[in-house]
Swiss-Prot record:
Gene Ontology molecular function: any one: flavin adenine dinucleotide binding
Species, as recorded: Prochlorococcus marinus (strain MIT 9515)
Summary of subunit composition and partner proteins: Homodimer. Heterotetramer of two MnmE and two MnmG subunits.
SUPFAM superfamilies the UniProt entry points to: FAD/NAD(P)-binding domain (SSF51905)
Domain of life: Bacteria
Lineage of the species this protein comes from: Bacteria, Bacillati, Cyanobacteriota, Cyanophyceae, Synechococcales
PANTHER family the UniProt entry points to: GLUCOSE INHIBITED DIVISION PROTEIN A, PROTEIN MTO1 HOMOLOG, MITOCHONDRIAL
Family as reported in the entry's similarity comment: Belongs to the MnmG family.
HAMAP family per the UniProt record, alphabetical: MnmG_GidA
Name the UniProt record assigns to this protein: tRNA uridine 5-carboxymethylaminomethyl modification enzyme MnmG
Length: 654
């Protein structure tokens, strides 16, 4: 039996886990003036990118912009360590434009460690936390006495105890983690690192349920063994674009190319012949994997009609030979993996440096959390990142920031910051996690948001930087830069609105010819910019623009003007939802009688009996569709009531 040893060290906040959620949480609480300790099993692997060495992509880039707008760190580091950047969905509308950066994973980790080491109020500690320590606190109301569980500290594997007022668990895939290659498995949080022991049992003993999920990562191959001449090149095309709104952020990393290959019929045949050797199809594990990042064997089985799948070869850094084979994760045995890789064009003589593997792990279903990411069961215990059932560094970082903010607000006896669906992708993600009983790893998608035109990456600072400044995470320098940008946006919008162009002007005739858009009489530059084939770049070309403006302001003005009508409609919808949140719900409603509600919504609404729509929207299991159905049901009831009253009045008057 391990002897318990009390440490004389105590902290306001302890963060368990040094991944992307843990780093954001620890930096946030420390920046806000609270003594913080970040505990991790391996101090050399902080903010590691164990899967894809990339940040951003559809919806994920919007999350990164939002974290940065609030004062978080992931966007800055992604910008500083990017070795390739691209804009995805560039041919589509601005609601789905997405910046994606290939990063140097070792440089990313190194710079994060430097930031942590130089952050005031923050201590780093290498230890495995195996137990949460709690105390029971009695609270009294007029009619009753209640006992609540409250966090008081942690215990390490070797028995040392540390006290803390608040704890944030960001354990990633490490809780009872087990990695699989074929039918062989071993205990590990990820390749080369031991799993976290004891903490799962501690959570169970405190009444917190965990379940199991799976994810995976592809093999890494030696770039010296690849025939790049046989491959399509994917160059860096957006090195001048940034996740961060901080004008000081720069990138001095060399920009390099990725490459594209494809699976072949031989690849597919080899996979089909060996499906029985994979952990999932062989029946060795039954945990659910991520729907939007399937293994190569899943792709071959589920899309059997496809003859080929695109595979991306992505460098893991400037000073490493490792190439990440994106889109080729697998659970097949190691010898078959190499055979598979060699069926890909350009890789017929490749050397595999690290095999692909699947990892299954315990997670906390987030229906056990509040919208602040505090656990319902235990006061001052928060949970963030992959342990909440998400997948992705971006989702983890956003949750870490939110948990850090709300842990400090709870200690300051302030109300939590609740991010709404209509205000941010952060709010969309957390709302989805809390209200849905998810059975597979969750990733953020633009399709998950009803307000994606409003929640663009380019306007994340306009939406969230005032809040970041109010909280205390945005400093005076950033705040001044933000206000200057807002001023420029307003002034340029006004200039375009008040500057007219006559159809007789030579510039007008040139724009007509190039855009195919007729100018009659005269028009303002603002109205001209609303036309689909006219862009701010045309104004620059014909000296109608303010060329001294930052690119972000030019782009922001054009998007605001082009989509003004859509944005107003979406804002009206948001305002309507906000008004509806105050709409009262009669306490006597029997939700079982409303068959348009989901079964889970009926059960939870009957149990909690919310008094208004705002409260109902925060109940786990009650989706936006449920709220809409409830609103329609109430409207029908009101109409029926009005008709009945009208009929009675007519009867009485006659």
């Amino acid at each position: 039996m391990k002897k318990q040893q009390s440490s004389n060290e105590s902290f306001d906040v302890i963060v368990i886990g040094g991944g992307h959620a843990g780093c954001e949480a620890a930096i946030t609480t420390a920046k806000l003036g609270f003594s913080t300790a970040l505990f991790t099993i391996n101090l050399d692997r902080i903010a590691w990118q164990p899967c894809n060495p990339a940040v951003g992509g559809p919806a994920k880039s919007q999350l990164v912009h939002e974290v940065d707008a609030l004062g978080g760190i992931i966007g800055k580091l992604a910008d500083e360590t990017a070795i390739q950047k691209r804009i995805l969905n560039a041919s589509r509308g601005p609601a789905v434009w997405a910046l994606r950066a290939q990063t140097d994973k070792r440089e990313y980790s190194k710079r994060m460690i430097e930031i942590l080491q130089n952050t005031d109020n923050l201590s780093l500690k290498e230890a495995m936390i195996t137990e949460l320590l709690i105390k029971e606190v009695e609270t009294f109301t007029k009619n009753s006495k209640n006992t609540t569980k409250q966090i008081k500290g942690v215990k390490t594997f070797f028995g040392t105890c540390y006290s803390a007022k608040s704890i944030i668990i960001t354990a990633g895939t490490f809780l009872e983690g087990r990695i699989w290659i074929g039918n062989k498995s071993m205990s590990a949080g990820r390749s080369g690192e031991q799993a976290a022991q004891g903490l799962t049992e501690s959570l169970h003993s405190l009444g917190i349920k965990t379940e199991r999920l799976k994810t995976g990562t592809p093999a890494r191959v030696d770039k010296k063994s690849i025939s790049f001449d046989a491959l399509d090149i994917q160059p860096s095309t957006a090195s001048d674009k940034y996740f961060s709104f901080d004008p000081k952020i720069k990138n001095d990393m060399p920009q390099i190319c990725c490459h594209i290959t494809r699976t072949t019929q031989k690849t597919h045949e080899l996979i089909r012949n060996n499906l029985h050797l994979t952990p999932i199809y062989g029946g060795f594990i039954d945990s659910k994997g991520p729907r939007y990042c399937p293994s190569i064997e899943d792709k071959i089985v589920k899309f059997a009609d496809k003859n080929s799948h695109q595979i991306f070869l992505e460098p893991e850094g400037i000073n490493t030979p490792e190439i990440y084979v994106q889109g080729f994760s697998t659970g097949l045995p190691e010898n078959i993996q190499l055979e598979l890789l060699r069926t890909l064009p350009g890789l017929n003589k490749c050397k595999m440096l690290r095999p692909a593997y699947a990892v299954e792990y315990e997670y906390i279903p987030a229906t056990q959390l509040k919208l602040s990411l505090e656990t319902i069961e235990i006061d001052n215990l928060f949970s963030a990142g992959q342990i909440n059932g998400t997948t992705g560094y971006e989702e983890a970082a956003a949750q870490g920031l939110v948990a850090g903010i709300n842990a400090t607000r709870k200690l300051n006896m302030k109300d939590p910051i609740i991010f709404s669906r209509e205000s941010s992708y952060i709010g969309t993600m957390i709302n989805d996690l809390i209200t849905r009983d998810l059975k597979e790893p969750y990733r953020v998608l633009t399709s998950r948001s009803e307000y994606r035109l409003t929640l663009r990456g380019d306007n994340a600072d306009r939406r969230l930087t005032p809040l970041g400044f109010e909280i205390g995470l945005i400093d005076e320098r950033r705040w001044f830069a933000h206000k200057e940008k807002m001023k420029l946006l307003k002034e340029e919008n006004s200039r375009l609105e008040n500057t007219r162009l006559k159809c007789t002007d030579e510039i007008a005739r040139n724009i007509e010819l190039e855009s195919g858009s007729k100018i009659k009489g005269s028009t303002t530059l603002k109205d001209l910019l609303k036309r689909p084939n006219v862009h701010y770049s045309d104004f620059i070309k014909y000296d109608l623009a303010n060329k001294s403006l930052p690119i972000a302001v030019m782009e922001g003005v054009e998007i605001d003007i082009k989509y003004e009508g859509y944005l107003k409609r979406q804002q009206n919808n948001i305002d309507q939802i906000n008004r509806q949140s105050l709409k009262s719900l009669p306490i006597e409603i029997n939700y079982d009688l409303i068959d348009t509600l989901s079964l889970e919504a009926r059960e939870n609404l009957n149990k909690i009996k919310p008094t208004n729509f705002g409260d109902a929207s925060k109940i786990p299991g009650v989706s936006k569709a449920d709220l809409t159905a409830l609103l329609v049901w109430l409207k029908i009831k009101e109409i029926k009531k009005e008709k009945t009253n009208s009929f009675v009045e007519k009867k009485l008057s006659s």
